[in-house]
Amino acid sequence: AKTDPPIHCASLXRSS
């Protein structure tokens, strides 16, 4: 997750 691209951030963020 840390090494993964900033996709999780956009997804979570967006969801939140």
From Swiss-Prot:
Posttranslational modification: Glycosylated.
Protein keywords: Glycoprotein, Glycosidase, Hydrolase
Top-level lineage group: Eukaryota
Enzymatic class: hydrolase
Catalytic reaction(s) noted: (R)-amygdalin + H2O = (R)-prunasin + D-glucose
EC number assigned by the record: 3.2.1.117
GO molecular function, one term: amygdalin beta-glucosidase activity
Subunit structure of this chain's protein: Monomer.
Protein name as it appears in the record: Amygdalin beta-glucosidase 1
Top-level taxonomy: Eukaryota, Viridiplantae, Streptophyta, Embryophyta, Tracheophyta
